[in-house]
Amino acid sequence: MFETLEEKTEEKAMVQFLERFTDYPFLIKFKNSEYHIGKGEPTFTVNFKKTIPLSDLVKSTSLALGEAYMRGDLDIEGNLYEALDHFLGQMGKFSTNESALKKIMFSSTSKKNQEKEVTSHYDIGNDFYKLWLDETMSYSCGYFIHEDDTLYQAQVNKVDYILKKLHLEEGMSLLDIGCGWGFLLIEAAKKYKIHGTGITLSHEQYTEFQKRIKDQGLEDYLTVELMDYRDLPKHDYQFDRVVSVGMLEHVGRDNYQLFLDCVEKVLKPGGLFLLHFISALKEHPGDPWIKKYIFPGGTVPSLREILTHMAEDNFHTLDIENLRLHYNKTLLHWEKNFLDNIEKEKSMFDESFLRMWNLYLSACAATFHNGIIDLHQILMTKGINNDLPMTRWY
């Protein structure tokens, strides 16, 4: 098949880029040629059905390759996760021209924009999420106590672990910021008989959580509100405990202090706050492809910047735990469930969306496996609390 000079130039550039990733052997395929990278039997094949413009690769390797995969111009023959794990393990070899990507990378963190960003991801449809999440509808990192724990068991473990860390007592009040479909608050109400309030910006989650409260007869214990965290101080709220699981990533770097200010205003003196969030070793604007297609307003904070902001609100750290590998395993479960239900998903979305979602789950799993991002839980008190046990009680 005839190749243009431009295609040959782009092919050469792509090979020169990929031949740096020599840790594991793999093949690169083009229309009329094939290249063997590394020593030994290839473990996967990168198949370019169409070359990628050099200017796109220079601007952002991640965005160029991600969009090519979504279009079907690029395919992975073999295990997608293992291929991505190989490349992301050598993340320093990717390139990003941040000034050229400024529009994508730095979006507004206004209330209106953040509501739009949250609903664009979480309001895709409950029926879709039910296909690949577990029965609890937990869309956050599980906690695998045993190697063979199911995804469902890991999510139950995670919630139990968080509730133990919060040192709950019957009759206490608990706020869940970014409550999702409500499993954490439902478990807290059943096991500890607390009075809980959940807030979310997702209409789909709000509707499903309301239904769950009614179905399980928990109307006297739980309420859910469509509310932005910035509106919490406007209400006459005072909670014994506050928890936020997987929501901080949507807040934006400019608003971390504001977020913690809002928590401080509604948490009673001596109260406990557990913050569960994806983090990075250092401050970084984020991955261009993820920012454009998955979490438009998302930013991954560093652990150190959150600790610095906490001090401004007199939050005292009790414990910090990293659950990075638990998220890797959670994502691999999600990916398997997603692929197991691909025929049903084809009736809901087009091929581009499904390829995008598969890439998202696999890439995130590989990112956690390589320590590019972490998952931290910080347990803290508002001011000093000398009434808690002196050793870890969970």
Question: Model-predicted segments: where are they?
Answer:
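Conserved class I S-adenosyl-L-methionine
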Residues: 170-178
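Substrate-binding/catalytic lobe of Class I Rossmann-like enzymes that use SAM or dcSAM, i.e.
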Residues: 278-388, 392-394
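Conserved SAM-binding strand-loop segment of SAM-dependent methyltransferases
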Residues: 217-230
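Feature captures hydrophobic
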Residues: 1-155, 161
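Conserved SAM-binding loop of SAM-dependent methyltransferases across substrates and taxa
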Residues: 181-192
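A short acidic, Gly/Pro-enriched loop at the edge of an enzyme's catalytic core
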Residues: 230-242
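A short glycine-rich, Lys/Arg-flanked "PGG" loop and its adjoining helix->strand segment in the class I
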Residues: 257-269
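Conserved beta-strand signature within the Rossmann-like core of class I S-adenosyl-L-methionine
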Residues: 270-278
